[in-house]
Amino acid sequence: MTSLDDSVLTKKNIALLDNATNYIRPAIDYFHFKFNYDSLDVSTTWRLLLKMRKHKLLRLPSCSSENEFDYSIYMARLYHCIWRRWSIKHFNLDEYKIDPLSINWNKEIDVTVLYGPDLVGIHEREQPTPTDFPMGNIKEQGKQLLDVRKEGSASSLLKKGSVFYSKGKWLSQRSISFDDTVRRRDIDKRGRFRESCVLINDVEQFQNYSIVWDESRHRYRRQALPDTYDYEHLYPNGDETPRNTPHDNIIIHQNLHSITEGSYIYIK
C-alpha cells in the first residue's frame, strides 16, 4: 500500500520525509552504487522514483524542483538508470556490458556519473554528544536553585561560587526607576497644541511635593515641599474644592484632592 499522506507511517513515507529534511545525508551515484538486491533496495527506489516523478517531492542533488523540465528529465534519467541496473542483474547480463568509452560516439565528453537521492535506508542524524554540554555547570546551578528553595531566600546565590559571581565581580542588575509623571501633548482641530504633565502615581494621602522641570535629566520630577508650607491658599472658602488658579511658574504646588489619577497639570 502506498500513500502520499505523511501521517501514514510506511517505509516509503519515512524515506521521503528523510530525503526532504535530512540535509546531511549524502547523494549516491546511480551508475556505481552497490545496491543490495537481496533486500529489494533497487525495486523500492524504482517504485519511489516512478511514483514521485509527477509530484516533485524529492530533493535532487543537482536539480531544482522549480524548473519543471529539468526536474522531469533528471527524474527520468534516474528512473531508467535504476531500471537498467535491475535488468542487468536479473537477466545476468554483466558479461555482455560494453565499455561506453570504447564506442566511437564522442563519449569522452558525456557524463560518467549520475547522482541521485538515497532512498534505500534511513540514516541516523548526528546528535550532540553529552560531552558537548557543560554538565558540571548545570549541576552546580541546579544545586544552587535547590538550596534557595530549601532556605526560602536568595542567600545562597550571594556566595562567591554562585553563577552571579564571575571573575571577582558581582553580576548586579542595574536599578530601574520610574517617574510619577509623564508628559503629554494635546493637539486640537486647528493644529494648536498644549503640553501637559500627567500624574500617574497619587497613592499618598497628601502630596507634600511640587512638580519641577529637571534640566539635567530633561524631564519632570517631584520635589519635596518644606513642612512650613501653607496650603490655606488652596481653600479660600473653607471647603475641600480647590480654586482654579493659573500656574504662571514652572513649579506647581498641588493637593491630592485637586489631582486624581489620570488628571492633567497644564503648564504654560
Curated annotation (Swiss-Prot):
Present with 2010 molecules/cell in log phase SD medium. This is Uncharacterized protein YOR062C. One of its GO terms (biological process) is protein catabolic process in the vacuole. PANTHER family: PROTEIN MTL1-RELATED. One of its GO terms (cellular component) is nucleus. It comes from the Eukaryota. InterPro entries: Glucose_repression_reg. To yeast YKR075c.
